[in-house]
Amino acid sequence: MAVDLVRLQLDVTDFDLARFQPYVDKCRTSGIRLTTLSELGDTPEHRRALYELNKECSADIPERGEFHTYDEYHRLRIEVPAYDPRGVVLALDGDRWIGMAATSDRRGSGFVFNEMTGVRVCHRGRGISVAMKTFGIGFAGICGVSTVRTVHHPANESAIAMNRTLGYVDADW
């Protein structure tokens, strides 16, 4: 039986940066570094680390099923026109990758798309996901669009609530 996914959309021109910047600041003052894969270096080693982080964080997605092999992941997520390392926000605690927020470039369709946002279990509940999404909101501007879209399984209530807090609204596309 097919599940009706929750479709959400954000108009970045309405995004309240002043409201969410404190999440970014809190990460920085607590020693969490926010960066992008582009700034860190889009290397084979970093792509492998991104895969491992994505795999770990995806385990909690309702009805996710088995995660891709690295080769499948690379083919489906990296070797595609929508991939841009500037859209991959990373949260680092020292050298340890603890969170990711990957957004793909769909500017040809008039938007960017939040593919995955996740934080390792031991670092959850500290606002890191909100900080990463806030830090990465400028990617839409880099791509020349003002719309960010995402989808969620309806049982992924925490992700849906976080996005709605950020200003995402239900969409019918």
Short names for language-model regions:
Residues 1-4, 130, 154-172:
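Conserved active-site alpha-helix within GNAT-family acetyltransferase domains
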Residues 1-42:
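Acyl-donor-binding surface of acyltransferase catalytic domains
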Residues 47-54, 73, 77, 133:
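Hydrophobic alpha-helical core bundles mediating ligand binding, dimerization, or RNAP-core interactions
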Residues 58-121:
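A conserved beta-strand-loop-helix scaffold within acyl/acetyltransferase catalytic domains
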Residues 120-124, 150-160:
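Conserved beta-strand-loop-alpha-helix junction that forms the acyl-donor binding cleft
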Residues 123, 127-135:
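Conserved acetyl-CoA pyrophosphate-binding loop and the N-cap/start of the following alpha-helix
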Residues 127, 144, 156:
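Conserved G/P- and acidic residue-centered "switch" motifs that form tight phosphate/ATP-binding loops
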Residues 140-152:
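Conserved GNAT acetyl-CoA-binding A-motif
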